[in-house]
Regions:
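Interfacial loop/beta elements and low-complexity acidic/Ser/Thr-rich segments
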Residues: 1-455
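Residues at structural and domain junctions
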Residues: 52, 201, 460-461, 471, ...
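Strongly charged, low-complexity linkers/loops
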Residues: 448-464, 469
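Extracellular LysM carbohydrate-binding repeats and other cell-envelope/extracellular binding modules
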Residues: 480-507
Length: 507
């Protein structure tokens, strides 16, 4: 007779892809007639943007564009000039499995880049982008949690796990005309643009969540004067978004990954015809995971006290994900300027942040590196550029043991000029770690009891058990009830602490 089991459905996130995909981007740019000739390229700033991610079958398609700002000097070398261009790209990823309702996030970064002036009017750019891709699907498992039959003894285990409610990709548009403050010179060319999205509050509610935050925009631009230095401008675009997810509630835990998306910055004329307005068009995408904490109970072993017993088991992988509170790290290093030739810092920024989380003995650690970029003016009134890669390791106590991952961003960078050859740079980082605890569980899949088999006659026995033996194993060997062995031997422990005789009575 096939035994009926009570089952519980468990929904968990299954990661069907986690890796880095390379994507080449090659382009060339010819300066318009109104631009000055290139004497020297100072810096090429590449900002890759993912515009869409779509799944079909076991294939994932990622579309985006690489936004490039090239800073260069003309023959005089006394002012920064620049141009910008964009190049679209498409990348395909083969998933490990075909699944429905796949959600994926792709974080682009620059792996390698060459920017070369072929002549005074043309620039060749060869870029290799890396796409850090993570794709998820919700897997549904039926787990046996008990057998309601007095002829069967069951052994159960409980796991505190994370239940998947849903994963949502949420894109929205932020658009604003930002006016320069009084006293700022009009804009001729945007030389550098960076956008950082900051999440301030996340409020779960029935059917989704309300997310508030802001987009922090920094601009370096060139004025219409060949003798004036480039100027900086920053602004904030606040946002409030409602993210919908079926089945979500106030008891959900929410994790948000902010993907940059599209970014377009265009100077616009004001009412008197001067370019003192910046039109900002941003289209960020949030990858929002909704989860709930729960307890899963599995029947990991069973046997019959009457009749022949045949059971089939399956192995399960259950997970508990813990998002640790954000941590701030300060990295302070010196950036050296060649030939003691520093007069003025025109701009400083950081790029290329990479983070790796790992464990070291009883501690958790995050190893990271990023590049500090410095645009400055020399004592001879010439414009120059230098950069330095900084690395750091942050060690702290590991309160939870598991597979660690980390996300982070540089929230601010400050500097102090200590002398004509040294700039002391201080970068503030915000990091958020996630710990995945994986449980290898065993669960009953099916079982049959042969009722035609004659039950064994009543018997009593004495078994001489060794220290360390489990009461369950002894009861299973003799097809006896665990409760009877505990009662007859006055033994409440699961594992015997000493050698002793065990009375076994089976009715």
């Amino acid at each position: 007779m096939r035994m009926e089991t009570n089952t519980e459905r468990y929904d968990g996130f299954e990661q069907i892809f986690d890796g880095v995909q390379e994507c080449p981007v090659d382009t060339e740019y010819t300066l318009p007639d109104y631009c000055a000739d290139i004497q020297k390229i100072l810096k090429c700033i590449v900002t890759p943007e993912v515009t869409s991610v779509s799944a079909a079958g076991d294939s994932l398609t990622i579309d985006g564009c690489a936004s490039m700002h090239v800073l260069y000097l003309d023959a005089k070398g006394g002012c920064v000039r620049g141009f910008d261009t964009k190049k679209e790209f498409t990348c395909s990823v083969r998933l490990r499995a075909q699944a429905e309702n796949v959600t994926a996030e792709a974080e682009p970064f620059v792996q390698h880049m060459t920017c070369r002036a072929m002549n005074a009017r043309r620039v060749d750019l060869h870029i290799t982008l890396g796409l850090s891709v993570r794709a998820y699907a919700v897997r549904q498992l039926e787990i046996a949690d008990c057998i309601s039959d007095d002829r069967v003894e069951t052994k159960c285990e409980e796991y505190g796990v994370t239940r998947a409610v849903g994963c949502v990709m949420h894109a929205f548009i932020l658009e604003q005309n930002a006016e320069l403050p009084n006293g700022k010179s009009p804009i001729e060319t945007v030389l550098r643009c960076s956008v950082r999205y900051q999440i301030d509050t996340v409020q779960p509610q029935a059917g989704g969540a309300v997310v508030t935050g802001k987009a922090c925009v920094e601009i370096l631009y060139r004025t219409f004067s060949d003798t004036a230095m480039p100027e900086r401008f920053s602004c904030i675009l606040p946002f409030t978004q409602t993210v919908e997810c079926a089945g979500a509630g106030e008891d959900c835990t929410i994790q948000i990954s902010v993907l940059g998306g599209e970014c377009t910055v265009q100077p616009r004329e004001d009412s008197v015809g001067e370019y003192t307005v910046l039109n900002l068009y941003l289209k960020p995408t949030f990858c929002v995971q909704f989860t709930k904490s729960c307890t899963v109970r599995t029947v990991c072993d069973a046997y019959s006290i009457k009749g022949a017993w045949a059971a089939k088991y399956k192995n399960l992988s259950l997970e508990r994900c813990e998002v640790l509170p954000p941590r701030s790290v300060r990295v302070k290093e010196n950036v050296l300027v060649p030939e003691n030739d520093l007069e003025q810092v025109l701009d400083i920024w950081c790029e290329g942040l990479t983070l790796t989380a790992f464990t070291e003995k009883e501690n958790a650690a995050v190893r990271g590196k990023f590049t500090v970029c410095l645009l400055y003016r020399t004592k001879e009134k010439q414009i120059a550029y230098t950069e330095r890669m900084l690395d750091f390791t942050d060690v702290h106590t590991a309160e939870i043991v598991g597979r660690r991952s980390v996300r982070g961003e540089i929230t601010s960078v400050q500097y102090v000029i200590t002398d004509s050859s040294t700039v002391e740079c201080t970068a503030e980082l915000r990091m958020e770690e996630q710990v995945r605890v994986v449980y290898a569980a065993r669960s009953l899949e099916s079982a049959e009891l042969d009722e035609t088999t004659e039950p064994e006659p009543c018997c009593a026995a004495v078994y001489y058990a060794s220290s360390g033996e489990k009461v369950w194993d002894i009861a299973k060997r003799y097809h006896a009830r665990v409760s009877a062995i505990r009662t007859h031997n006055d033994c409440m422990e699961d594992v015997l602490s000493e050698d002793r005789p065990v009375i076994i009575c089976r009715k």
